[in-house]
A protein has these predicted regions:
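Short, solvent-exposed loop/edge segments of extracellular or virion-exposed proteins
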Residues: 25-27
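Hydrophobic h-region of N-terminal signal peptides that target proteins for export
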Residues: 10-18
Length: 376
């Protein structure tokens, strides 16, 4: 009897598993997004929805949405012309509620938002894809006495770093903008993919890329849910605390723990928006540290000490002062002021004026453009 019950139980389990497999087999196979013949089709299975819409970052305004049509098995669908080659983000609105594409595993985090990703292949986006020879990306913790907390940064090491035990590398300190953190450049910016491709093609020198958290009160990205510092960094007494920490704590940490070349000619600094401000501040406060200076989408205030600080940069010497900004960017007037200050003080520089505004569309392009110019 006991054996019979055991056999019946086993048979029941087999039937249950088969039933589950059948249920899985009968589920609707939704493919989204699907790029074909110059068009992109987006699909979402939403059984009880009455209105489903699509919003994509390639659309002109945040209020613009494209209605989707309900088809068989409650799969909503819309086909649109493929935007120009680039990386875009998108999401659906189901009865007014924003949701990501559940069938798309490619996701980017922008601050406190997760967004589905669309990569349209082409010349501009070629270096945003995975390379054949890939470097490593790691999260590294360090102690900051200046900021009073243990903090995290993201570090990229190029392909071959682990095996070339004696080779030393130059370092790019790559800074994010407001609302970002130490993961912004590796997620939204595709920094690792861009460097991997440029290095593999021989267009850029193999380099270490350090991406710190530019929010002085944060230990790390908010995804870790760690408490923030209670120090008021808006207090003038704490002015430039993060920039000072970058130069006096992060750089020594990197040069001690990585095979980094500890010389001015092997250090570059670049940043977007808030990070662009950190870039100019770091080079004006510490003019003898970096040979390559690349602020993006930011401005520079003209004040009584600016000329003296610019003259100090000129005296210390540098190899590249590269500025990138979109002509439709709200930071463009500030960029024009920066250029005027550099001209007034006789500092050679390059202005890369692109179209577009204050977006990753431009910042990825800028990294892809200036990285080959570093450490030459």
């Amino acid at each position: 009897m006991k054996r019979l019950m055991t056999l019946l139980a086993a048979a029941f389990m087999v039937l249950a598993v088969n039933a589950q497999e059948l249920a899985n087999f009968q589920r609707v196979n939704v493919v989204s997004p699907e790029i074909k013949d110059g068009q992109v089709t987006f699909r979402l299975k939403a059984d009880y929805a009455t209105v489903v819409e699509l919003y994509g970052s390639w659309m002109p305004g945040y209020g613009d949405r494209i209605p989707m049509t309900r088809g068989e098995n409650f799969v909503w669908e819309v086909t649109v012309p493929a935007p120009s080659p680039e990386i875009y983000t998108y999401n659906f609105y189901v009865d007014g509620v924003s949701v990501n594409d559940p069938t798309n595993v490619l996701v980017q985090r922008d601050g406190n938002r997760y967004l589905s990703m669309l990569l349209v292949d082409g010349e501009r986006s070629e270096n945003y894809k995975e390379a054949n020879k890939r470097g490593s990306v790691s999260h590294v913790w360090y102690d900051s006495e200046l900021l009073g907390i243990n903090r995290r940064m993201t570090v990229y090491t190029p392909y071959g770093y682990e095996t070339s035990k004696k080779t030393k590398y130059p370092v790019l300190y790559l800074l994010h903008g407001g609302g970002g953190d130490e993961e912004a450049w590796s997620s939204m910016g595709r920094a690792a993919q861009i460097l991997d491709n440029l290095i593999e093609k021989g267009l850029a020198k193999p380099m270490i890329v350090v991406m710190p958290n530019g929010n002085p009160g944060q230990q790390a990205a908010q995804t870790l849910n760690l408490p923030v510092s209670d120090v008021n960094f808006r207090d003038p007494a704490n002015a430039n605390a993060y920039v000072k920490s970058l130069v006096t704590e992060i750089i020594p940490f990197v040069e001690k723990n990585y095979r980094a070349i500890p010389k001015k000619e092997a250090r570059a600094i670049a940043g977007l928006s808030m990070g662009g401000g950190h870039t100019t501040s770091a080079t004006m406060l510490f003019p003898g540290v970096f040979d390559y200076i690349c602020p993006m989408s930011c401005g520079l205030r003209d004040g009584e000490n600016v000329d003296a600080q610019m003259q100090a940069i000129k005296k210390a010497g540098y190899k590249l002062y590269w500025i990138g900004c979109g002509t439709a960017d709200f930071a463009w007037p500030g960029t024009e002021t920066m250029v005027e200050i550099l001209k007034r003080n006789g500092l050679e520089h390059t202005l890369y004026a692109s179209d577009g505004g204050h977006t990753w569309y431009n910042w990825r392009l800028y990294l892809n453009t200036f990285a080959p110019l570093l450490f030459k």
